[in-house]
Regions:
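Short helix-loop capping/hinge segments that flank enzyme active sites or metal/cofactor-binding pockets
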Residues: 52-67, 116-175, 187-191, 228-234, ...
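Short, well-ordered beta-strand elements within core beta-sheets of diverse protein domains
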Residues: 13-20, 150-155, 247-248
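Short glycine/serine-rich loop/turn segments
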Residues: 1-15, 66-69, 118-119, 188-207
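A short helix-breaking turn/cap at a secondary-structure junction
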Residues: 1-81, 85, 127, 259, ...
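Short, well-ordered beta-strand elements
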Residues: 17, 241-250, 257-258
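Short, surface-exposed loop/helix-turn segments at secondary-structure junctions
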Residues: 41-45, 111-116, 162, 194-216
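Conserved short alpha-helical elements in the N-terminal third of ANL/AMP-binding
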Residues: 221-224
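Short, Asp-centered acidic motifs that coordinate Mg2+ and/or phosphate
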Residues: 182-184
Length: 277
């Protein structure tokens, strides 16, 4: 699960956990949610605990079903099967599911988000090298990290603010869309899990960038808009690999996502499913 966007990478990145149960995600969020004294930004606080929230019966939700990838193209067959299966399960549990799309230009957002992450990567690397008392050195990091670092050094202040403004505009459009829906259901990634080594951070930088850009598909949209989101494994390929489905909700409504995920976990348990090695 990824909670509301906070301060990391200009708001694009928020740390949480990869867990095997909704209970663990809820409990960890109870342990970490809320601002520290002096934080310049803060997400809305949850009334009560997230662990208590997942124990309550979920209310009926209006769910927008996205059946296209970030380019507006048809999904990979496994991903399409995953979201359709999840939609049927949600419908069987009493939720209202209909095909709808916030119609945000995810392709145009990519290079703008890349500016933000590159500039923040450059700052993080410089801080680390300073703490170590060393000069920036390509041998200290992966080739991809070094390329992103170099890009970040060249991002101007105006370019950075333009990118932040674009993310904020996308967030406002997403918020307007979510006045009509509680949750957006989409694929998590563009395809089934790739083989180890497919994303080689010490390989060709252009190849890595192209592969990551295509594989992440719709999830970077929610990094930009700040909407909380959660992925759950409701579909498995014939050879036993999990294909995630992705639920995104309104700003400040992590409890809605966790409650829905808990309901899905009860209806279709995944805890004991482990891919064959």
């Amino acid at each position: 699960m990824a909670p509301d966007a906070g301060e990391g990478w200009g708001g694009l990145s928020t740390g949480h956990v990869v867990s095997r149960s909704v209970r663990d995600s809820a409990l960890m969020l109870d342990c970490t949610a809320g601002p520290e004294p002096g934080d310049p930004y803060a997400a809305p606080m949850q009334e009560g605990s997230f662990l208590e929230a997942i124990a309550r019966p979920p209310r009926q939700l209006r769910i927008a079903l996205m059946l296209k990838d970030h380019r507006g193209a048809r999904l990979h067959p496994e991903c399409l099967a995953a979201v359709q299966r999840a939609a049927k399960l949600c419908d069987s549990l009493g939720h209202i599911v209909e095909e709808a799309d916030p119609e945000l230009d995810m392709v145009a957002l990519r290079p703008l988000s890349a500016r933000i992450s590159a500039a923040n990567t450059a700052r993080s690397c410089n801080m680390r090298w300073k703490a170590l008392g060393r000069e920036p050195n390509a041998d200290d990091v992966e080739s991809v990290t070094w390329a992103v670092y170099q890009h970040g050094l060249k991002v101007s202040g105006v370019e950075y603010i333009e990118a932040i403004a674009a993310a904020h505009a996308a967030g406002r459009k997403m918020a307007r869309f979510l006045t009509g829906y509680d949750v957006i259901l989409s694929t998590t990634l563009a395809g089934p899990p790739p083989r180890l080594g497919y994303f080689d951070q010490n390989g060709d930088v252009q190849t890595f960038t192209e592969r990551v850009t295509e594989y992440l598909s719709v999830t970077p949209l929610h990094n930009a808009t700040g909407t909380p989101a959660i992925s759950v494994p409701l579909h498995w390929t014939a050879d036993g690999l999990p294909v995630g489905v992705h639920f995104a909700g309104r700003y400040g409504e992590e409890a809605t996502l966790l409650t829905l995920a808990a309901e899905l976990e009860t209806a279709q348990p995944w805890f004991d499913r482990v891919p064959a090695l």
